[in-house]
Amino acid sequence: TNSHFMNAHGLQDENHYTTPYDMYLIFNEAIKYSTFTDAINQQSYTVTYTAGDGEQYERTWFATNYYFTGEATPPDNVTVFGGKTGTTDEAGACLSLLTKDPYGNSYFSIIMKADTKDDLYSDMNDLLSIINKKQL
């Protein structure tokens, strides 16, 4: 691989780096777990957990994926199954996305280092539009 992670949260570290292919490998492995696929396929995801002090807590995460918040629409004949977003000043706006075509074929798409979130989703839609060209 061509990745080196210094932390689990993904925030900037000068020795923290990855590639689109390595993100694909990680994402491809993660979708084998129903907890992950459930979480990436919803507008919000709530968990209850027991902390080290024995207390139970509930936490809800809300989607930042524009396809789930309604701020972006994928091309025709492309269904967004779910994805993982990430944005830092150094990395830019990033998105790993799992989509499907009308025939049930799955596609992984990854955009990294977009200048803005609007650019990220414009670039992603350009990439996803290739799915329709493949079907011609």
Sequence positions of predicted segments:
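Penicillin-recognizing serine hydrolase domain
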Residues: 1-136
